[in-house]
Amino acid sequence: MDTLGRKVVVCDNGTGFVKCGYAGSNFPEHIFPALVGRPIIRSTAKVGNIEIKDLMVGDEASELRSMLEVNYPMENGIVRNWDDMKHLWDYTFGPEKLNIDTKNCKILLTEPPMNPTKNREKIVEVMFETYQFSGVYVAIQAVLTLYAQGLLTGVVVDSGDGVTHICPVYEGFSLPHLTRRLDIAGRDITRYLIKLLLLRGYAFNHSADFETVRMIKEKLCYVGYNIEQEQKLALETTVLVESYTLPDGRIIKVGGERFEAPEALFQPHLINVEGVGVAELLFNTIQAADIDTRSEFYKHIVLSGGSTMYPGLPSRLERELKQLYLERVLKGDVEKLSKFKIRIEDPPRRKHMVFLGGAVLADIMKDKDNFWMTRQEYQEKGVRVLEKLGVTVR
């Protein structure tokens, strides 16, 4: 709370999950799927102890997903369906989750780098007009990740459910001209895994199956260090085969798909996306930075977001970066490679890094009036109040 006794809320609206809680806490109070579902047919009023309503949100929508038409209001980190997004916020602030009186609270929200201004304006408008928060701040996700890691300078590789960003931050300011975006993230890997499992003869086609395959992915997928070697193992042995029990009791076997699905992050062409993979994009980003800052960036690469949780991802990233540096900078001179210092930080709680950084920032700033956009300022200036966010949130 601030000195006036107002709660300070932190809400990290991801494409796949909402992480919300309070300033100063070191874990989100609530984490739930960012989905909204509507019953396909109204047959029963209750399933187990969950009442079926015309509109189901979050955890309940996820549990009853086989009976619902489910929608994600956000796609690639950007709100696509504002009506559903409001339902999601009603659920977040209402009795089911935070249960707060929004009029007497401040809120820190997060947004992806390179977020369209229109999107940010609309978020601020909804926060002040619909929920009437007393203060609002919108922070860039990558900067919050570094705060959570106790750094002011570094490169964040943030890969969530909807979008992957590579975002260099220098002395606490994100560098928009160097920020790169890759529209491949958790959701695309899940889709690709569905396709790969289909080739094995398992059909997952209902919108509810998507959640099931996501769970398979989280449990079994990993990033191969040496892709040729993994493929050889998959073809010639059964070492990689694991069984997975589906919600209906059926058991399926998953083998080479375990590393083939996340490989799309490194080789986008596998899912028909043009452009370079995450390792090369990271290399290009750092090489495009000012020559004096490059070595700092190579030494402070921070992973963030659920799609960086694959076992094997940090070591594969390091291997590819060294390879690219050797070929393109050192022109093959192996002798000099030993001088090349690189460090990839993979904090164990990186799934919630953005929230943690937001909780730290909101706590430090809770009483600083010049930090928050206030309801009064919004009433006077409208969306021009965003100018107050200044350069840090470009």
Swiss-Prot record:
GO cellular component term, pick one: cell projection
GO biological process: Arp2/3 complex-mediated actin nucleation; positive regulation of double-strand break repair via homologous recombination; positive regulation of transcription by RNA polymerase II
InterPro entries found in the cross-reference section: Actin, Actin/actin-like_CS, ATPase_NBD
Amino-acid positions noted as binding ATP in the UniProt annotation, renumbered to this chain: 160-162, 214-218, 305-310
Functional note: ATP-binding component of the Arp2/3 complex, a multiprotein complex that mediates actin polymerization upon stimulation by nucleation-promoting factor (NPF). The Arp2/3 complex mediates the formation of branched actin networks in the cytoplasm, providing the force for cell motility. Seems to contact the pointed end of the daughter actin filament. In addition to its role in the cytoplasmic cytoskeleton, the Arp2/3 complex also promotes actin polymerization in the nucleus, thereby regulating gene transcription and repair of damaged DNA.
Keyword NAD among UniProt keywords: no
GO terms for MF: actin binding; ATP binding
Compartments in which it is found: Cytoplasm, Cytoskeleton; Cell projection; Nucleus
Claim: Transmembrane helix is one of the keywords in the record: no
Keywords: Actin-binding, ATP-binding, Cell projection, Cytoplasm, Cytoskeleton, Nucleotide-binding, Nucleus
Family per similarity comment: Belongs to the actin family. ARP2 subfamily.
Top-rank taxon: Eukaryota
Assembly and interaction partners: Component of the Arp2/3 complex composed of ACTR2/ARP2, ACTR3/ARP3, ARPC1B/p41-ARC, ARPC2/p34-ARC, ARPC3/p21-ARC, ARPC4/p20-ARC and ARPC5/p16-ARC.
Protein name: Actin-related protein 2
